[in-house]
Amino acid sequence: MELGFTNCLLILDLLRHFEIGYITKRIAVIGAGVSGISAANTLVDAGYSVTLFDQGKSLGGRLGIRTLKVPPYQGRNIDVGAAYFTASEEDFKLKVEEWLRQKLAHQWVDTFSVIDEDGISNKSGPMRYVASGGLKNLLFFEIANLKDKIDYFQDYKVTEVEINNKVRVDKKQFDAVVLALPAPQAGRIVLNSEIKSELSKIKFNPVLVSWFSSNIDLAFDGMFVNNSSAVNLLINEGSKQRDNNNICTIYSTHEFAAAEINDLDLAKEKLLNEANKILNINSSYLESGIMRWTLAHPMPSERPKMPSNVAIVGDAFSDNPRIEAAWLDGSRVLEQLA
């Protein structure tokens, strides 16, 4: 029986409607941080069938939060990954406007304190944005809008990615894969030796993030520290969240983190003491803690050449690695896929 041209078109439309595998390309995205969720958004909008894998118990990548446990701040979330974000490119400004409309994010400050050998001064810069309850909440919002459109596996550790004409992620076949996790982690799961070699060229610096709550008022918003071998940045969490809670986060220098990363208790003590010295306070802490980020800041890197069915996204390939760079790189994922 001859179907006829019109009937064939109807059948193709039905196949597309039901997203049969050989009509709709199936793409795996590994990593549900900023760039991974941005890439998943772009791929879904372009009509691809997306499966998103993330190994963490919670999504977010380097958008880490901790919940305080000691009164009077019990239940209060603090950022222990990225502290804030800025927006310079129009595409990202549109996304930020959406977060602002949803009351997920708000403007914080455009001026930080700077301390160096000459004392304390103020430095103006771009507007810093923060998120109510922590930056990770931005990605919770994004994944809530994506969940019904993708297959999503949280707390799932991918063990192997085989890349040939097709891609296999833990033996499951896809047409392409997006590596949206730090290159050292990607290199541990990719089986192809040439791709492993390319990924091994991308390096990251570590950072330790400590924090404390106290009864002492903190008379600053954010502070760049240029005269300490241990501390790089201080953030007043009470200022960020507009609740004036006396909570400070302390971001280490790369060099300090590399030297102290294997003894977190000692590192925390050193960072707390240094912060007290910088702020000229003598605080007894209600609560304190420390977080280790082995893969915190990417060193300057060229994006490695990948097969046409592999994309690698993230802020590692930006001159200014940050949340904006990660989001935009993920949103441009189709430029890497054939």
Predicted segments — roles?
Residues 58, 66, 73, 80, ...:
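Conserved flavin/dinucleotide-binding core of flavoenzymes
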Residues 60, 73-75, 174-221:
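Central helical "cap/lid" subdomain
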Residues 69-110:
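N-terminal FAD cofactor-binding segment of flavoenzymes
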Residues 84-88, 120-141, 262-267:
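Short beta-strand to alpha-helix junction loop
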Residues 44-69:
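Glycine-rich FAD pyrophosphate-binding loop
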Residues 153-166:
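A conserved short coil-to-beta-strand element within the FAD-binding core of flavoproteins
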Residues 211, 216-217, 222-261:
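Active-site substrate-recognition segment that forms the wall
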Residues 27-52:
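N-terminal Rossmann-like FAD-binding beta1-loop-alpha1 element of flavoenzymes
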